[in-house]
Each structure stands twice: as structure tokens, then as C-alpha cells.
């Protein structure tokens, strides 16, 4: 029996790790959040214009945001790469042998890429986005998963509401490269005929015939659900997420608290009150919200003084969330960047090297913050119009989710004081409007300096620090 290895504390994340031959021992989940002992293959099921790609993209964005390496594989895009010019629905007719051959080759090419991603590139979840409307096709994909050691989870989207289908068709026409520069009525007619090509052979997931499979069936964009044999934690997270999203038109407003007394002094964290300009911003925010005339707006704040003072000026009910509190800077709370460089130069350099994963001594990392904020994302997905008054690091995390930003980009997203970001979900993404409320404030954004080496001189460490009192 091997003797226990020595432990050492990782300087970046502040977690204890075993050492082997003088080097830290790596483990399978070094780069991501490990929630399952084997990769997961998510297989979309459903007729065209049922929201499969919408679900695929949202699910991929969510899983990547919480730290699970995920990639979407859209078979339609593989087909467009092979067949450069789409002509008509006849390509999808069941008796079109050439079309069938090309579609099968594209599906196999996508599965090869799935295998590469999950088995060679360290991926945890692959989303296979295609119609997969026959039991035979789904069995082929399931067998592929079994042969490669993947857990397979099916997500079927069923729509019988004509209004939902019509709205989906409009979105597909707007977003699909197949119908660029095509007459609208002609495109609609062709797409309806394309759907008919699948309808006769469509076999929905069946509670008896498919009782051994793991799946969720989503009816009419979340009116009801059927869930069967959830196999592990990651599948339960997927089900929970899919049961929270909706497509009702709405806007989410994100802003930071008004300028604080510590912002003026260039100090991070703490629980200060608003500066005079911060109080002026709170009044301007109240006027802005009133002018917007937003139906049933909900207002959320953190439990920190500066966000609550900002919300008080609105004169409306608001809800305080502890999870919306600013990132905990640990031993560096209420310090300036200059003081951190003087007292903890190693920590300052390590944070610049990997700002997303770096954890303050006795504090948090952005990675920790994302995990803390997941309940907020779930509730934002459930809600309609919401104003979130929060903090710089928190706002960056929320913004990264809605804009699908990578972990490396997240800590450097610009979220200036006294500016409201209006996020409006659209077909496969999010429209962003930035509204500055004309109240001056200090700049608190610090870019990554060019020199992030531990031995750098102080002036190179501090070159990107914004001006302050």
C-alpha cells in the first residue's frame, strides 16, 4: 500500500493538494467543475422550429458559466458546410437518397467531433443538436455513447401550440443562413414543407418503449414536463435549469450601486455608504426607472449598505440577497491596490496571472462567486422584468452569463459606475443597451498589466491602477 503523499497549499486557489516528485499531482477535474465520473452526451430531439437550438445554446452557455466544459454540435451547420447553397425542402424528403446520405455523413462527422471533444480534449458535456426524431437514430447515438463510456441524456422539445410554432418559425427564418435574402412568404412555405418531411416518421420519446433511457420532455416551452431516470448530479442540474427557463419577452436591468466613499479613495470591498455623487446617481436612477414605465418590475439588491441606499431612493419595494454581496477580498478588504502591492506583492501578481481562479487569502475568487450566484441566475431565468443593483465583480459574473463570455474574459468586463445595462433576450443571445445617467463617478476598472511576473517592479504592477484620492 502506497504511503500518503505530502500536501501543499496551491498559492492560486488556496486549496490543499498532494505533491508527487516535487510537483503537484493533477486530477481529472483540474480545469473544470467535476460533477460526474464520466462525460455526458446531451441529445436534442424534436421537429424543426421546436426551440431545440435555442435550448442547446442556453444550456451550453449555462454549463460553461458554472465551470463545466461544454460544447454544442449543430448537425445543421455541418450540413451547411457540405452543401454550400440551400435550395429547397426537397433535400429533406425521405426518398431523397443523396440528401439522406449527406445528412447521415454529417451526423457521423458531428459524432466524431463529439468523441474528440469528450475523450481527447477534456470536455465534460457535449450537446448534439439535431432532430433525432426516430427511435432508430436515437438508438445509434445511445450505442455510440455506451461504446465511448458516455452517459446519454435526451432532451425532447414538443410544441402543439400553433402560436408557439409560428413564433419559432419566425425566429428560425430570421436566424437561419438557409433563408438569407429569401422572400419571407417563400421562406415560410419552404420551412413548413421541411417540417412535413419529418412529421410522418417522428417517434416521440415513449414512457414505456423508452423507460430505460434518461430524458426530459418539454411541452410547449415549459407548460409541462416529463422527466425519466435522471442518472447523476449533472443531469439533475440540467433538468433544474431547463425547468426554469422561459421565452416570455422581458428585460433585465443591471447596475452597480452609486459611487461609494471607498470608491473615491481607490479602496476595494468594505461596506461604505454612498458619496454625494453616489446619492445623486440614486436619484437619477429613480427618475430613469420611473420614465421607463416597466411593468411589474422587481428590484433586487445585495445586503451591503451602498446598494440598499441606492435602492431606497427608488421609493419602491426591493428584495435583499446576501448572495449578491461583493466578492470577499479577505485580508485585502478595504485596501488600495498600492497597499496590496506593498503588503502582498506575490498575491497581487498571482491574481494578475489568473484573475478568474485566484482566491484572496481568507476570501473568494471569481470562480467562487459564480458558484455563489447560480441561484440568482436561476431566479432571473424564471422572472420577467428585474432591476439588479449590485457590485462590480457580481455584475461581471451576471453579465458574462448573459453574454456568453469565457472565464478568462469575465474579470475584465467593463461595468462602470452610474451606468445601467439593459439586457433583452433575443433569439439565440442577448441585446445590450448601455445607458449612462449623466452623473460623474470615479473609474474603478483595472486592466490586466502587461507584466504579471512575480518578480516585476512595483511600478509595472501598478501601471493600470485607476486614479483615486
Curated annotation (Swiss-Prot):
Catalytic activity: beta-D-fructose 2,6-bisphosphate + H2O = beta-D-fructose 6-phosphate + phosphate; beta-D-fructose 6-phosphate + ATP = beta-D-fructose 2,6-bisphosphate + ADP + H(+)
Site positions for Transition state stabilizer: 391
Binding site for beta-D-fructose 6-phosphate: 79, 103, 131, 137, 173, 194, 198
Residues found modified as Phosphothreonine: 444
Region (6-phosphofructo-2-kinase): 1-249
PROSITE patterns: PG_MUTASE
Active site positions: 129, 159, 257 (tele-phosphohistidine intermediate), 326 (proton donor/acceptor)
Keywords tagged on the record: ATP-binding, Hydrolase, Kinase, Multifunctional enzyme, Nucleotide-binding, Phosphoprotein, Transferase
Chain sites annotated for binding beta-D-fructose 2,6-bisphosphate: 256, 263, 269, 306, 337, 351, 355, 366, 392, 396
Highest taxon of the lineage: Eukaryota
GO molecular function: 6-phosphofructo-2-kinase activity; ATP binding; fructose-2,6-bisphosphate 2-phosphatase activity
Region span, Fructose-2,6-bisphosphatase: 250-469
Bridged cysteine pairs (disulfide): none
EC number: 2.7.1.105, 3.1.3.46
Activity regulation: The most important regulatory mechanism of these opposing activities is by phosphorylation and dephosphorylation of the enzyme.
Family, as annotated: In the C-terminal section; belongs to the phosphoglycerate mutase family.
Protein function: Synthesis and degradation of fructose 2,6-bisphosphate.
Name the record gives this protein: 6-phosphofructo-2-kinase/fructose-2,6-bisphosphatase 4
Lineage of origin: Eukaryota, Metazoa, Chordata, Craniata, Vertebrata
Gene: PFKFB4
Amino acid at each position: 500500500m502506497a504511503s500518503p503523499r505530502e500536501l501543499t497549499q496551491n498559492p492560486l486557489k488556496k486549496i490543499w493538494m498532494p505533491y508527487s516528485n516535487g510537483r503537484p499531482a493533477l486530477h481529472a477535474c483540474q480545469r473544470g467543475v467535476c460533477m460526474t465520473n464520466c462525460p455526458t452526451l446531451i441529445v436534442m430531439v424534436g421537429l424543426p422550429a421546436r426551440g431545440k437550438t435555442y435550448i442547446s445554446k442556453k444550456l451550453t452557455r449555462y454549463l460553461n458559466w458554472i465551470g463545466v466544459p461544454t460544447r454544442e454540435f449543430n448537425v445543421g451547420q455541418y450540413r451547411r458546410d457540405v452543401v454550400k447553397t440551400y435550395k429547397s425542402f426537397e433535400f429533406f424528403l425521405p426518398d431523397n437518397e443523396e440528401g439522406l446520405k449527406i445528412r447521415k455523413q454529417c451526423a457521423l462527422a458531428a459524432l466524431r467531433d463529439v468523441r474528440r471533444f469528450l475523450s481527447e480534449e477534456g470536455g465534460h458535456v457535449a450537446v448534439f443538436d439535431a432532430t433525432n426524431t426516430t427511435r432508430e437514430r436515437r438508438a445509434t447515438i445511445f450505442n455510440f455513447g455506451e461504446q465511448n463510456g458516455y452517459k446519454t441524456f435526451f432532451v425532447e422539445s414538443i410544441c402543439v401550440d400553433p402560436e408557439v410554432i409560428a413564433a419559432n418559425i419566425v425566429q428560425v427564418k430570421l436566424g437561419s443562413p438557409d433563408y438569407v435574402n429569401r422572400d419571407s412568404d417563400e421562406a415560410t412555405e419552404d420551412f413548413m414543407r421541411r417540417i412535413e418531411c419529418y412529421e410522418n416518421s417522428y417517434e416521440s420519446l415513449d414512457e414505456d418503449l423508452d423507460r430505460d433511457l434518461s430524458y426530459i420532455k418539454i411541452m410547449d416551452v415549459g407548460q409541462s414536463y416529463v422527466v425519466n431516470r435522471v442518472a447523476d448530479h449533472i443531469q439533475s442540474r440540467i433538468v433544474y435549469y431547463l425547468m426554469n427557463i422561459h421565452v416570455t419577452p422581458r428585460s433585465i436591468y443591471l447596475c452597480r450601486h452609486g459611487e461609494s466613499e471607498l470608491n473615491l479613495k481607490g479602496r476595494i470591498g468594505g461596506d461604505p455608504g454612498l458619496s454625494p455623487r453616489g446619492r445623486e446617481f440614486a436619484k437619477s436612477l429613480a427618475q430613469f426607472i420611473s420614465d421607463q414605465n416597466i411593468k411589474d418590475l422587481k428590484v433586487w439588491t445585495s445586503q451591503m449598505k451602498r446598494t440598499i441606499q441606492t435602492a431606497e431612493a427608488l421609493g419602491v419595494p426591493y428584495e435583499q440577497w446576501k448572495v449578491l454581496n461583493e466578492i470577499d477580498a479577505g485580508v485585502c478588504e478595504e485596501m488600495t491596490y498600492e497597499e496590496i502591492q506593498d503588503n502582498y506583492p506575490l498575491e497581487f501578481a498571482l491574481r494578475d496571472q489568473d484573475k478568474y481562479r485566484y482566491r484572496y487569502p481568507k476570501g473568494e475568487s471569481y470562480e467562487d462567486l459564480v458558484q455563489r450566484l447560480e441561484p440568482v441566475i436561476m431566479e432571473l431565468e424564471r422572472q420577467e422584468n428585474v432591476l439588479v443593483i449590485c457590485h462590480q465583480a457580481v455584475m461581471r459574473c451576471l453579465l458574462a452569463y448573459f453574454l456568453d463570455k469565457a472565464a478568462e474574459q469575465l474579470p475584465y468586463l467593463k461595468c462602470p459606475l452610474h451606468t445601467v445595462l439593459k439586457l433583452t433576450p433575443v433569439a439565440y443571445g442577448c441585446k445590450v443597451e448601455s445607458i449612462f445617467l449623466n452623473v460623474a463617478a470615479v473609474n474603478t476598472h483595472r486592466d490586466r498589466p502587461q507584466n504579471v511576473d512575480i518578480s516585476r517592479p512595483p511600478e509595472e504592477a501598478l501601471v493600470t491602477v485607476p486614479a483615486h484620492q
